[in-house]
Amino acid sequence: MIADNKAIKKRIIELQAKLNIIFPQLYIDFLAKINDGDVYEVDDSGICLYSYSDLEERNQTYQIKDFEPNYFMIGQDGDLGYFINVGNPTDNSIYSNDLGALGSLEMEKESNNIFDFIGQNEK
């Protein structure tokens, strides 16, 4: 991770406007700390979290908005996707679901926020 980057935060705000969604603040803070274009791997877990520049393409590829309109995919581990709730931007929780079962299975809460999810205690 790198220090907060104002240029990246500006691009995140532009992405939110383009997609007409609002990310939870702690997730914005996380995105601003990782390098653009880098995939953030959670230790050696196989879980990869996308940088802001990959988010739109990944969500389009998996048609997330069609199947889970209140959620936005932020990463994955094989067929398991990780999501934030953009239907409630005050919800900082991280959720998961099988990418082949979107829309038919309930989202499963994995963590209270992105920093707990990656094993860091920051805000």
Please report, for each region that a protein language model flagged, where it lies by residue.
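Segments surrounding the PLD/"HKD" phosphodiesterase catalytic module and close analogs
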Residues: G81-K109
